[in-house]
Curated annotation (Swiss-Prot):
Subunit structure: Homodimer.
Protein name per its UniProtKB record: Carbon monoxide dehydrogenase
Keywords: 4Fe-4S, Iron, Iron-sulfur, Metal-binding, Nickel, Oxidoreductase
Species this protein is from: Methanopyrus kandleri (strain AV19 / DSM 6324 / JCM 9639 / NBRC 100938)
Gene Ontology biological process terms in this record: generation of precursor metabolites and energy; response to hydrogen peroxide
Name of encoding gene: cooS
UniProt xrefs under CDD domains: CODH
C-alpha cells in the first residue's frame, strides 16, 4: 500500500511561496485550496485504475481484473479492458485538439467577413501554410486564408471512409506510403474520434490489436492535423513567434492594476483581451486602478508569450502553468479569470465564492461552475473580450478593499528570452547552420520536452527541470512546449545566463548567439510544429545524402516527463505513430495488460519506428535519451 503523502515538493520558490500563502488562507477559509493541498489526502490510489484493469461501462460493473477474476462479467480480459480504456482516453484527447482546430479555422475563415475583426498578421506564414497544404499560394491574402480554412474544416468533417487530405498534405510522401501499406491513413478527424467511442462502448469491439491500431490513427490526427493546424493558423492571425525578451513569474501580478488571468489553449478566442484592455484603460483608472494587465497562464499564456513581440503592452507576461493557477488566484490580486479550454480547474469556483474573483467562460467546454458564459464567435470576438474586461474592472472595484487583508504580493519574477519558432530561428541563425552544428557534433541533437506538469511524478515542475538540465549538460539543445515552460521559466532556463549549465560546446553556441540552452517553442499545441520540424530535417538530410533517411534516424527525441491528462496521451500517440523516440513519466495506465505493454514497449519500432521509454528517474531518463541520440547519429554516420 502506498503511504500517505504529507506534502508535495516544489521545483522553485515561486510556486512554494504561493502555496504557503494559500495554506494560510485555507486555515481561515477551508474552500480555498490548491492542488498541492488536496493531493496528499488522495491516497491510497486504486491499483486497478493505475494499471488500467478497471471497467465501469455497464451496470454489471464495476469489474476489476485480478488473478482470481481474470475476466469481467462480459468475458473481457485485461488486454481488452486496458486497450479499450486507452483508446477512450486518446479519443478524448484528440477530440480536445480538434475542437481547438475547428475554432481556429472558423476565425481564419472570417478574415474575408467585413464584420469580423480578424486580420492577416503574417502573410509569409499564410503563403507557407498554403504551400504545405498544397493549395494555391498566389491569390489575395483573404482568399488564401478562406481556402485554407475551408480545406481544414471540410477535412475534419470528412467521413471516416474518406482519407484525410490534410494529413496527406502535411506528412512526407515516403511516410504516407508506409501508412497506406499498414492501413493507418486516418479519415476525417471527427469521424475517427466518433468511431473510437463506438468501438469502446459496451460489448462492441473486443480486439485489443484493432483498438491499438485505432490509437495510432488518432495519433496521426492529433499531430499533423490538429496541433499543426492550430499553431499554423495562430501564426497567420497573430504573427509568427519572434525572439524577444519578456518578464514573467508570479511577481508580474501588480496590486495597482486590474489583473485578468487566462486559462486555456485557444489564442483565437483570447487575443482580443489585450486590445480590450487597452481600449478600456480609462474605465479601469476611473475604478481606481492604474490600468489593466492580461496575465498569461496555462498554454494560452504560452501562446501569448511566444507572440509577445506582436502584442500591446497590456500583456504583462507569463505568470504560471496549469497547477499554479489556483495558487495565483490565492494571492488576492487576480480580479478575473477568463477561460476557454483546459487547464481550467474546477477548484476555481471557490475563488469566486470566497474571494469574489470574476469567472468568465468564452467557450462552454471550459465553463467553471458559477462562471458567466459569454460565448465567442468570430464576428463577436472584440465584443466578448470587452465584456470580459468590463466585468474584471467591476470586480476590481468591488473586491479589492473587501479582501485587502488577504492579499499577498509575490516576489518572484524573472526575465526570459522567448519567441523561438520555425521562422524566427531561420531568421536569427538559419536551420542549415543548426544542422551543420548537429552534423559537426557541437550540438549532439535536439530534445523536445513538452506537455503538462503534475504532482504525482516527483512534484510540481520538478522532473521537467531535472530532465532539461540532464540534456543540456550533454550538449543537447532543448525545445520546451507546453506547461513545462512554466517550470523552465521559474528555474531560469529561458535566460541566456543558463548557458553556464550546458556542456562546453552548447554553452559556447548559446553565448555566441545570446540565447538560452532551453528554447521556448510555444504551447503544447506547438508539438505539431516540432513534429513538422523533424519532417523538414529528415527531408533536408534525404536531399543532402541521397539516402532514405526516415524520422527515427533524425537525432531528435521527445519527452513528456510529467504527462497529466488525455490530451497528453494523444500527444504521445502522435509522436509514436510518427516514428519519434519518446520518453514518458509517470507510468501510463496500461501495465495490467501484457499485450498492450509489449506492443508499446517492444513492437512499435517495427511498426512505425516510434520508440517508447518509460522512466521515472530523470537522471536515468536523460542518460537513455542521450544514448538514443548517439545511436541515431551513428546510423547517419555523423
Amino acid at each position: 500500500m502506498e503511504e500517505k503523502r504529507s506534502s508535495c515538493p516544489y521545483a522553485d520558490e515561486a510556486v512554494c511561496e504561493l502555496v504557503e500563502h494559500a495554506k494560510e488562507l485555507n486555515e481561515e477559509i477551508p474552500e480555498i485550496e490548491t492542488p498541492h493541498i488536496r493531493w496528499p489526502v488522495q491516497f491510497p490510489k486504486c491499483p486497478y485504475g493505475k494499471q488500467g484493469v478497471w471497467c465501469n461501462i455497464c451496470s454489471n460493473g464495476p469489474c476489476r481484473i485480478t488473478e482470481k477474476t481474470p475476466r469481467g462479467v462480459c468475458g473481457a480480459t485485461a488486454d481488452v479492458i486496458v486497450a479499450r480504456n486507452f483508446l477512450r482516453h486518446v479519443a478524448a484527447g484528440a477530440a480536445c485538439y480538434v475542437h481547438c482546430l475547428e475554432n481556429a479555422a472558423r476565425a481564419l475563415k472570417s478574415v474575408a467577413d467585413e464584420e469580423s475583426p480578424y486580420e492577416i498578421a503574417d502573410e509569409k506564414a499564410l503563403r507557407h501554410a498554403a504551400e504545405v497544404y498544397g493549395l494555391d499560394t498566389s491569390g489575395k491574402p483573404e482568399d488564401v486564408a478562406e481556402e485554407i480554412a475551408e480545406f481544414i474544416l471540410e477535412d475534419i468533417y470528412r467521413p471516416r471512409y474518406e482519407e484525410s487530405e490534410v494529413f496527406k498534405a502535411v506528412v512526407p510522401d515516403w511516410r504516407i506510403e508506409m501508412y497506406e501499406e499498414m492501413g493507418l491513413i486516418p479519415g476525417g478527424a471527427k469521424s475517427e474520434i466518433h468511431d473510437a467511442l463506438v468501438k469502446t462502448s459496451t460489448n462492441l469491439n473486443s480486439d485489443p490489436v484493432d483498438m491499438l491500431l485505432h490509437v495510432l490513427r488518432l495519433g496521426l490526427i492529433t499531430g499533423p492535423v490538429a496541433l499543426f493546424g492550430v499553431e499554423t493558423i495562430n501564426d497567420i492571425l497573430f504573427g509568427s513567434p519572434k525572439i524577444t525578451q519578456t518578464e514573467g513569474g508570479p511577481g508580474i501580478l501588480d496590486p495597482d492594476y486590474v489583473n485578468i488571468m487566462t486559462t486555456g489553449h485557444q489564442m483565437a478566442l483570447m487575443k482580443y483581451l489585450t486590445d480590450a484592455a487597452e481600449k478600456l484603460e480609462e474605465e479601469a483608472k476611473a475604478a481606481g486602478a492604474k490600468g489593466i494587465r492580461i496575465i498569461g497562464a496555462t498554454c494560452v499564456g504560452d501562446d501569448f508569450e511566444a507572440r509577445a513581440e506582436h502584442l500591446p503592452d497590456t500583456y504583462a507576461g507569463f505568470a504560471g502553468n496549469n497547477f499554479a493557477t489556483e495558487a495565483l488566484a490565492a494571492t488576492g490580486l487576480v480580479d478575473a479569470i477568463v477561460s476557454e479550454f483546459n487547464c481550467t480547474f474546477p477548484g476555481l469556483k471557490f475563488y469566486k465564492e470566497k474571494l469574489d474573483v470574476e469567472l468568465v467562460a468564452v467557450d462552454d467546454v471550459a465553463k467553471v461552475w458559477g462562471a458567466e458564459l459569454i460565448l465567442w464567435d468570430p464576428e463577436r470576438a472584440e465584443e466578448v473580450a470587452e465584456e470580459a474586461v468590463q466585468r474584471a474592472i467591476e470586480a476590481f472595484k468591488e473586491r479589492r478593499s473587501k479582501h485587502e487583508d488577504k492579499i499577498m504580493e509575490p516576489k518572484h519574477r524573472h526575465e526570459n528570452v522567448v519567441g523561438f519558432g520555425y521562422f524566427s530561428i531561420e531568421e536569427a541563425v538559419g536551420w542549415e547552420n543548426v544542422l551543420k552544428l548537429i552534423e559537426e557534433g557541437t550540438i549532439r541533437g535536439v530534445c523536445a520536452i513538452m506537455g503538462c506538469t503534475n504532482l504525482s511524478s516527483g512534484g510540481h515542475n520538478v522532473p521537467a527541470v531535472e530532465l532539461a538540465k540532464e540534456m543540456i549538460k550533454r550538449d543537447v539543445l532543448v525545445l520546451g512546449a507546453g506547461c513545462v515552460n512554466g517550470a523552465f521559466a521559474n528555474a531560469g532556463l529561458f535566460n541566456p545566463e543558463a548557458a553556464e549549465l550546458a556542456g562546453d560546446n552548447l554553452r559556447q553556441v548559446c553565448e555566441e548567439l545570446g540565447i538560452p540552452p532551453v528554447l521556448h517553442y510555444g504551447p503544447c499545441l506547438a508539438i505539431g510544429k516540432i513534429e513538422h520540424l523533424v519532417f523538414e530535417i529528415a527531408e533536408i538530410l534525404r536531399e543532402k545524402t541521397g539516402e532514405e533517411i526516415d524520422i527515427p534516424d533524425v537525432p531528435a527525441v521527445a519527452s513528456a516527463p510529467q504527462w497529466l491528462e488525455e490530451q497528453a496521451l494523444a500527444d504521445a500517440s502522435s509522436a509514436l505513430a510518427l516514428g519519434i523516440t519518446l520518453h514518458v513519466s509517470p507510468v501510463p495506465p496500461v501495465t495490467g495488460s501484457e499485450l498492450v505493454t509489449k506492443t508499446l514497449l517492444e513492437d512499435l519500432p517495427d511498426l512505425t519506428g516510434g520508440e517508447l521509454i518509460v522512466e521515472t528517474d530523470m537522471k536515468r531518463a536523460g542518460e537513455i535519451l542521450a544514448e538514443k541520440i548517439e545511436e541515431k547519429r551513428k546510423r547517419l554516420g555523423i
